């Protein structure tokens, strides 16, 4: 989504940054896990397909995606590469054509050692606050596998209520209507959040040959963040996610 192309959200436990091609290799390693693919209802993709997917999400105006970083590690000095701070991702999907104020939320803490420490809760609250204040959302929905009890409990703690269950898809649907009291509660829970500009850093080479990259259905980005320069091999896919 172009709206958050230069936006980072800094919380106490997590930092949310736009999903760029710098993050793709580690994300690809995560999704080799059969457990994660099952919990997120995802298909296994090749590295090339992951880059193409990231590029397409850069342009899609109905997808707001952030990578979740460990705030403590990210704030260390000297600052480590973002890839080494990655712990998961969080998304808002604005795909209901009849109701543009509804956002479907997904959160994944991919690193097992970071689970059950409140990172998923804070990441969800940060993106919900962003959705309410920047995207005009008044309703949130989460679809979760029936066996994923930790995620169900987390969203219930965020005031979501179960509204449907599908035995066919083995999932439950939870929803939160953002009334004025709920909006106030969300903003209170995220009063510590800082919104900062996410500036393009010096491009780093991706781990693929030029011939491989030319076969991708995504124009190669220039180091300045503009699309289309096939002579540049960078890890920054226009920072349009």
From Swiss-Prot:
GO terms for cellular component: protein-containing complex. Residues 34-181 form the N-acetyltransferase domain. It catalyses: N-terminal L-methionyl-[tubulin] + acetyl-CoA = N-terminal N(alpha)-acetyl-L-methionyl-[tubulin] + CoA + H(+). It comes from Mus musculus (Mouse). InterPro entries: Acyl_CoA_acyltransferase, GNAT_dom, NAT9-like. It comes from the Eukaryota. Belongs to the acetyltransferase family. GNAT subfamily. This is Alpha/beta-tubulin-N-acetyltransferase 9. Its EC number is 2.3.1.308. One of its GO terms (molecular function) is tubulin N-terminal-methionine acetyltransferase activity. N-acetyltransferase that mediates the acetylation of the N-terminal residues of alpha- and beta-tubulin. Keywords: Acyltransferase, Transferase.
